Amino acid sequence: MKVLWAALLVTFLAGCQAKVEQVVETEPEPELRQQAEWQSGQRWELALGRFWDYLRWVQTLSEQVQEELLSSQVTQELTALMDETMKELKAYKSELEEQLTPVAEETRARLSKELQAAQARLGADMEDVRGRLVQYRGEVQAMLGQSTEELRARLASHLRKLRKRLLRDADDLQKRLAVYQAGAREGAERGVSAIRERLGPLVEQGRVRAATVGSVAGKPLQERAQAWGERLRARMEEMGSRTRDRLDEVKEQVAEVRAKLEEQAQQIRLQAEAFQARLKSWFEPLVEDMQRQWAGLVEKVQAAVGTSAAPVPSDNH
């Protein structure tokens, strides 16, 4: 009987231990859980997740990492990821600040100050990571081909510490942003309440006006239709009279413009004919004179040519 109880006890304890181990194995690490939140959160969290992934790759200190650490490739990548994270964070903070408008000025200033401090700590953490990698590159280059095993070990230790601090400050920033967002939501609800209070009297006035219109609608439909028809007929007659008057005015204006244009055209025609006659009187004497001079010149040339072509008398007899 004791052996049976002992066997049952051992089986029970083994089962409990298996359950505990299963729970421990299924529960994600804080860093992995935080990274999962970054991958499905706001845009600044996604950018921070990319920075975090790149830092994890750098921590492997593989041969490719060590080669790129000796150049400026790693620091350039980290700088780009840092700038992207801070840019998205600033944009998200500005968006929340716009939503905090209905909140009291004192509360908004306090939340903004706390959030700005948390944002500065996160930026300083990322800057420390980049600075440590720059320092490592300088130390390796100063070794001049010697063993850098100790330098790599120290770098790995520092990166682990920096990663923990970065995780802590990022978590703190997320919490403060959650408070900031809650304040913005509360301010928005207050703003909606204020709008409802302002719109309440207007809605009541609209309801009263609708009731008045409903009472008027109780009149006989034929009577109201007749009144509307008379008003419409009078309005159409008035518009027709105005249109006819306007057409008459337009016709008169068109006739007047046409007469002026014809008169101006006649004046231009007369001026052109007079100018043509004047030009003709100017140039005809000149042309005739040039013709006379040309005729005289031709005669002189012909006479000269005839004289030179006459036969010269011979002296041989």
Curated annotation (Swiss-Prot):
Residue positions binding heparin: L162, R163, K164, R165, G229, E230, R231, L232, R233, A234, R235, M236
Recorded GO MF terms: amyloid-beta binding; cholesterol transfer activity; heparan sulfate proteoglycan binding; heparin binding; identical protein binding; low-density lipoprotein particle receptor binding; phosphatidylcholine-sterol O-acyltransferase activator activity; phospholipid binding
Location of region: 8 X 22 AA approximate tandem repeats: 80-255
GO biological process, one term: phospholipid efflux
Residues covered by region (Specificity for association with VLDL): 278-290
Record region (Lipid-binding and lipoprotein association): 210-290
UniProt PTM comment: APOE exists as multiple glycosylated and sialylated glycoforms within cells and in plasma. The extent of glycosylation and sialylation are tissue and context specific. Glycated in plasma VLDL.
N-terminal signal peptide: 1-18
Assigned keywords, A-Z: Chylomicron, Endosome, Extracellular matrix, Glycoprotein, HDL, Heparin-binding, Lipid transport, Lipid-binding, Oxidation, Phosphoprotein, Repeat, Secreted, Signal, Transport, VLDL
Residues the record lists as Phosphoserine modifications: S147
Annotated region (LDL and other lipoprotein receptors binding), positions in chain: 158-168
PANTHER family (alphabetical): APOLIPOPROTEIN (PTHR18976), APOLIPOPROTEIN E (PTHR18976:SF2)
Protein name, UniProt field: Apolipoprotein E
Biological classification of the source: Eukaryota, Metazoa, Chordata, Craniata, Vertebrata
